From Swiss-Prot:
Chain sites annotated for binding Zn(2+) 2: 80, 82, 106, 109
Binding site for Zn(2+) 1: 64, 67, 90, 93
Principal location class: endoplasmic reticulum
Protein's gene: Marchf2
Function: E3 ubiquitin-protein ligase that may mediate ubiquitination of TFRC and CD86, and promote their subsequent endocytosis and sorting to lysosomes via multivesicular bodies. E3 ubiquitin ligases accept ubiquitin from an E2 ubiquitin-conjugating enzyme in the form of a thioester and then directly transfer the ubiquitin to targeted substrates. Together with GOPC/CAL mediates the ubiquitination and lysosomal degradation of CFTR. Ubiquitinates and therefore mediates the degradation of DLG1.
Protein name per its UniProtKB record: E3 ubiquitin-protein ligase MARCHF2
Length: 246
């Protein structure tokens, strides 16, 4: 059975009626408990996670609204004003989601998170600059630069040597022609290098703005948790218990 319910996750492409990349599939068989299958995608269509877990109708434990896993190994937080099944989230999952969606607030209740953004290093952009066309352009320009630079240097050196020889033989016309050819060659090479470098600098600047490491400034739940978070966790447990189908 395939349900048409849509998971309103931050930054998701929420079109469950036509998109198979974000759906819930419940298989009721006699071989085992029903399973929950969820695929989470970001704004640019990249698959962030695929989650398969067994459903337990008697369970009243909250789970992360992004990865749909419980508090196994990592505590669940309630960093915003969302309640019910959308109120709990892992800190690492939320950081990954905010980094992928390039936002700093909850897109459901619009609560602004206290985050610290750090730009990613240049090596990550060189490994994965983005779309396939940009990656192909970067590779081609780097290969051309590696091969054209020594060719331009050798060609210019040969032209200048030829111009010197023609000057010794009093062939000024040929010498002027070789010097003009050298100047034109280096002008074209410098212009191509500057245009290519400026183009890739713009791509890197845009990539750096939209691909940052996001760190939440939220203290995870521990023994010294404040009463506000305790009340949120208690209300979340009650809300999930009420919404759990029997």
């Amino acid at each position: 059975m395939t349900t048409g319910d849509c998971c309103h996750l931050p930054g998701s492409l929420c079109d469950c009626s036509s998109s198979p990349a974000f759906s819930k599939v419940v298989e009721a068989t006699g071989l085992g408990p029903p399973q929950y299958v969820a695929q989470v995608t970001s704004r640019d269509g990249r698959l962030l996670s695929t989650v398969i877990r067994a459903l337990d109708s008697q369970s009243d434990c909250p789970f992360c609204r992004i990865c749909h896993e419980g508090a196994n190994g990592e505590n669940l937080l309630s960093p915003c004003g969302c309640t019910g099944t959308l109120g709990a989230v892992h800190k690492s999952c939320l950081e990954k989601w905010l980094s992928s969606s390039n936002t700093s607030y909850c897109e459901l209740c619009h609560t602004e998170f206290a985050v610290e953004k750090r730009p990613r290093p240049l090596t990550e952009w060189l490994k994965d600059p983005g779309p396939r066309t940009e990656k192909r352009t970067l590779c081609c320009d780097m290969v051309c630069f590696v091969f054209i630079t020594p060719l331009a240097a050798i060609s210019g050196w040969l032209c200048l040597r030829g111009a010197q020889d023609h000057l010794r033989l009093h062939s000024r016309l040929e010498a002027v022609g070789l010097i003009a050819l050298t100047i034109a060659l280096f002008t074209i090479y410098v212009l191509w290098t500057l245009v290519s470098f400026r183009y890739h600098c713009q791509l890197y600047s845009e990539w750096r703005k939209t691909n940052q490491k996001v760190r939440l400034k939220i203290r995870e739940a521990d023994g010294s948790e404040d009463p506000h978070h305790s009340l949120l966790a208690t209300g979340l447990l009650k809300k999930v218990a009420e919404e759990t189908p029997v």
